[in-house]
């Protein structure tokens, strides 16, 4: 029987090679089960004895500096491992259940971020996103659910800006998912008093040209971000809204007035990470092997709101008559399916059934 150290290392290496985003170690009444999340699918990897599961979770808790003896409360931890294939950052989260603790591991490989033209399904959209970086100040907002690729897009834009514009770029994230030696990266640490709002205030005194704000979570952070955008800084950030228009109303909920939105917001991009059609599987990949053998399995689509269309949407939010016309996520995904780029399940997963 392999040692628990070897089991844990093999598990991480396999997840890395499979390009899994998460590992789920789930205890059951008599045994346990391990799942890999590959793309959007949760795929069963193996069964495990209950005793081995408890030892494995305890081992990961020890490595990530959690309290091994505490099994009644949820805990979080993280660590970075050096594998033969490269470095990987792991974010751990335990959850007490009726069948012992469950553990989910977020797997974040530390390799180069693809350029925006390789991320975007449609090259024209990627070129438009890059054009926004020419602005010296203002705010560029990305919206979408967790796992829609917002952080990857932000870092792809950061790399482009660093290479072509030579700017002083500072990021504020919770947590820092991708390490980049070319930018100053600050991690939110609420226990130490480094909240989003406090961290952003400190960054403004550090002579930044470009600020990457992981997420606008509260009214104070929104206010400081808007102030930064109005005083000569280019701010890239994210919000959780269903579509691009929703970001306007979200900022209003945070107490940002219409004039400030008009003066600062350059563009809003609603993003989704969609499954590309597999040349081998008619109804989408069902096996880990098939998913692993394809280098490019997903791409990003963006609903872009900028220029006249953005101004018209702001007018609509004011209660005025508006006339705008831009491609919605529904139309973009439908176009991708019609061209044979995307699987039909993308439509059911990401599109809300409403009028265009």
Curated annotation (Swiss-Prot):
Matches recorded under InterPro entries: AAA+_ATPase, ATPase_ComGA, P-loop_NTPase, T2SS/T4SS_dom
Cellular localisation: Cell membrane
Gene Ontology biological process terms from the UniProt entry: establishment of competence for transformation
Topology of this chain in the membrane: Peripheral membrane protein
Key words of the record: ATP-binding, Cell membrane, Competence, Membrane, Nucleotide-binding, Transport
GO molecular function: ATP binding; ATP hydrolysis activity
Induction remarks: Expression activated by ComK.
Superkingdom field: Bacteria
Phenotype on disruption: Transformation deficient.
Similarity-based family: Belongs to the GSP E family.
Entry-linked NCBIfam families: ATPase_ComGA
Protein name, as recorded: Competence protein ComGA
Native organism: Bacillus subtilis (strain 168)
């Amino acid at each position: 029987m392999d040692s628990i150290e070897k089991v844990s290392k093999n598990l991480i290496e396999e997840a890395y090679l499979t390009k899994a985003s998460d590992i789920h170690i789930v205890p059951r009444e008599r045994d346990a089960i391990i799942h890999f999340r590959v793309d959007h699918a949760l795929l069963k990897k193996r069964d495990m004895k209950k005793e081995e599961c408890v030892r494995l979770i305890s081992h990961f808790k020890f490595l990530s500096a959690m309290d091994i003896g505490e099994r009644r409360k949820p805990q979080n931890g993280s660590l970075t491992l050096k594998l033969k294939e490269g470095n990987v950052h792991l974010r751990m989260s335990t959850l007490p259940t009726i069948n012992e603790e469950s553990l989910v591991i977020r797997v974040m490989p530390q390799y180069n971020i693809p350029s925006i033209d390789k991320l975007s399904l449609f090259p024209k959209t990627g070129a438009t996103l890059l054009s926004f970086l020419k602005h010296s100040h203002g705010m560029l907002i990305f919206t979408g659910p967790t796992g829609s690729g917002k952080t990857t897009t932000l870092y792809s834009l950061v790399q482009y800006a660093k290479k072509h514009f030579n700017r002083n770029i500072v990021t504020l994230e919770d947590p820092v998912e991708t390490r980049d030696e070319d930018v100053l990266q600050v991690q939110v640490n609420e226990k130490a008093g480094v909240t989003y709002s406090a961290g952003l205030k400190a960054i403004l005194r550090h002579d930044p040209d470009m600020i990457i704000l992981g997420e606008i979570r509260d009214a104070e952070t929104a206010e400081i971000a808007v102030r930064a955008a109005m005083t000569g800084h280019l701010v890239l950030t994210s919000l959780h809204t269903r579509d691009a228009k929703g970001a306007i109303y979200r900022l209003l909920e945070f107490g940002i007035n219409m004039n400030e939105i008009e003066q600062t917001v350059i563009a809003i991009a609603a993003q989704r990470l969609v499954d590309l059609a597999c040349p081998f599987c008619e109804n989408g990949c069902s096996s880990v092997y098939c998913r692993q053998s394809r280098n490019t399995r997903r791409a990003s689509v963006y609903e872009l709101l900028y220029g006249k269309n953005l101004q018209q949407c702001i007018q609509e939010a004011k209660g005025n008559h508006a006339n705008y016309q831009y491609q919605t996520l529904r139309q973009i995904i439908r176009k991708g399916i019609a061209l044979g780029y995307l699987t039909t399940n993308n439509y059911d997963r990401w599109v809300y059934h409403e009028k265009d």
